């Protein structure tokens, strides 16, 4: 174990789903034989964190729980079986904290589908604390010297949308429509799509979000509160429909609409998780147009490495708002109102 590790730390914890989010002193966890102990400097805040707190997904959380799964910090200790890491390395805590590494899914690099997957901020205390543990195999390697506040959202939001774009099977010059284009996921999806050579159409609401979309390099913006017919407008703007659609919004209706404006032989990718939602697609339309509808979960270790590399080369940058960890409850309030533009990051020292 390294020196100067305190016994207690500041963190945000809740004891029942939907209960009070308490900013308080809690114990510093001890790393297991296969784990790193990471001094978390910054953590992104994801919509999944809100679901974990509310407990409204069909997967139960551990309780009590420290949320968060976009933690960026410095390795300060490690278990005796850890290899390939050293004290002082920059490391990231991802949604997938650990997996069995021996099942069919892990063997095929689909670790997120592992039946024994351990999830940061859900089944494993996450990054809304100053010190957190992560399986050394799954922890993300971050180049030393990286701005940890800016890289934090890449660890989930960035990896997730990058994997989704890969799942759309697009080629340079193709149109990709991003539903929810100016939120935490969408704002990164726009940049990854541009960096991958795609033409980007964004769907969201409001002048502030339209400006952000354009500032990020998006080509055509549709305000869903003003458009009279979104499918028709997408088809007209793209001269035939989007080759791929990335659904990061939490609107069941938006998902249904996307099956109507995707191009023949195109792919609709589902990422956002509206509560109790169903994906509705006209079977005749889907068959005759040869449309694919796929779900895209989080990326694997290779996707993570590639997503961070895009960031390190300056090709993507999360539009972030940095506030103190103690302000987390107010961020959740903004999330529930749909009032967030870009991505919130919490500073664990405040």
From Swiss-Prot:
Cofactor names: Zn(2+)
Family according to the record: Belongs to the zinc-containing alcohol dehydrogenase family.
The record's comment on cofactor binding reads: Binds 2 Zn(2+) ions per subunit.
Q: What is its EC number?
A: 1.1.1.1
Q: Which UniProt keywords apply?
A: Cytoplasm, Metal-binding, NAD, Oxidoreductase, Zinc
Q: Does the keyword Cytoplasm apply?
A: yes
Q: How does it assemble?
A: Homotetramer.
Q: Name one GO molecular function term.
A: zinc ion binding
Q: What class of enzyme is it?
A: oxidoreductase
Q: Coiled-coil segments, which residues?
A: none
Give the organism's phylogenetic lineage: Eukaryota, Fungi, Dikarya, Ascomycota, Saccharomycotina
Q: Which protein are we looking at? A: Alcohol dehydrogenase 1
| Catalyzed reactions per annotation | a primary alcohol + NAD(+) = an aldehyde + NADH + H(+); a secondary alcohol + NAD(+) = a ketone + NADH + H(+)
- Give me the residues that bind NAD(+), please: 180-186, 204, 209, 271-273, 343
Q: Which domain of life is it from?
A: Eukaryota
Q: Write down the Pfam families for this protein, in alphabetical order.
A: ADH_N, ADH_zinc_N
Primary gene name: ADH1
Q: Where in the cell is it found?
A: Cytoplasm
PROSITE patterns given for it? ADH_ZINC
Q: InterPro entries attached here?
A: ADH-like_C, ADH-like_N, ADH_Zn_CS, GroES-like_sf, NAD(P)-bd_dom_sf, PKS_ER
Q: What is its main location?
A: cytoplasm
Positions with a binding annotation for Zn(2+) 2: 100, 103, 106, 114
Residues annotated for Zn(2+) 1 binding in this entry = 46, 69, 156
Would you tell me the Gene Ontology cellular component terms?
cytoplasm
């Amino acid at each position: 174990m390294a020196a100067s590790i305190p016994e207690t730390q500041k963190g945000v914890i809740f004891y029942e789903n939907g209960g009070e989010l308490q900013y308080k002193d809690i114990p510093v966890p001890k790393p297991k034989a296969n784990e790193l102990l990471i001094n978390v400097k910054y953590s992104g805040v994801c919509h999944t964190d809100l679901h974990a707190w509310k407990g409204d997904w069909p997967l139960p959380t551990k309780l009590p729980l420290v949320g968060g799964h976009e933690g960026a910090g410095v390795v300060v200790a490690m278990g005796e079986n850890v290899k390939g890491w050293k004290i002082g390395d920059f490391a990231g805590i991802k949604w997938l904290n650990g997996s069995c590494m021996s099942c069919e899914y892990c063997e095929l690099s689909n670790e997120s589908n592992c039946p024994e997957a351990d999830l940061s901020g859900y089944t494993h205390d996450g990054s809304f604390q100053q010190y957190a543990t992560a399986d050394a195999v799954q922890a993300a390697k971050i180049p030393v010297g990286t701005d940890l506040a800016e890289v934090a959202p890449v660890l989930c939001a960035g990896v997730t949308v990058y994997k989704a774009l890969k799942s759309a099977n697009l080629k340079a010059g193709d149109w990709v429509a991003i539903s929810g284009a100016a939120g935490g996921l969408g704002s990164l999806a726009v940049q990854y799509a541009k960096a991958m050579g795609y033409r980007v159409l964004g769907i969201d609401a409001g002048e502030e979000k339209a400006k952000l979309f354009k500032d990020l390099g998006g080509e055509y913006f549709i305000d869903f509160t003003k458009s009279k017919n979104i499918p028709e407008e997408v088809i007209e703007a793209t001269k035939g429909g989007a080759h791929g659609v990335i659904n990061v919004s939490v609107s069941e209706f938006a998902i249904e609409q996307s099956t109507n404006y995707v191009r023949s032989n195109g792919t609709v990718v589902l990422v956002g998780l509206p509560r109790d939602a169903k994906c509705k697609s006209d079977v005749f339309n889907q068959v005759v147009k040869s449309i694919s509808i796929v779900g895209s979960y989080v990326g694997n270790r290779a996707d993570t490495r590639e997503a961070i590399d895009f960031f390190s080369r300056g090709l993507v940058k999360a539009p972030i708002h940095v506030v103190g960890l103690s302000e987390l409850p107010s961020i959740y309030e903004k999330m529930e109102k749909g009032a967030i533009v870009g991505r919130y990051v919490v500073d664990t020292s405040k």
